[in-house]
């Protein structure tokens, strides 16, 4: 049986056009975002499936170096005698969110045992 022309048994062409319009133009608008996400997903897949090569280990070693240099910068030279007599300051640095995130990343990188990361600056 075929539904009558005025019945609601089948979605109207206006409704179908609206659905097409919304989905098509949302897809067109997000085209650049989709390209970036696809590239990131592809790079992540390649990185995860790659064997532990020298390039991979060098990347992790450099990342650890930069994180540690950001976490523990060199102490500035003391300018006056009073501060020199007092001695270098202890571990009283304020934990900012960025420093906390760096410490978390650093600890996670140190705990990964699947990658042969050279333990530098430990």
From Swiss-Prot:
Alphabetically sorted, this entry's keywords are:
Cytoplasm, Membrane, Nucleus, Transmembrane, Transmembrane helix
Superkingdom as given in the UniProt entry: Eukaryota
Q: Name one GO cellular component term.
A: cytoplasm
Q: Where in the cell is it found?
A: Cytoplasm; Nucleus; Membrane
TM region(s), chain numbering: 9-25
Q: How does it sit in the membrane?
A: Single-pass membrane protein
Q: Does the keyword Disulfide bond apply?
A: no
Identify this protein by name: Uncharacterized protein YBR090C
Lineage, top ranks: Eukaryota, Fungi, Dikarya, Ascomycota, Saccharomycotina
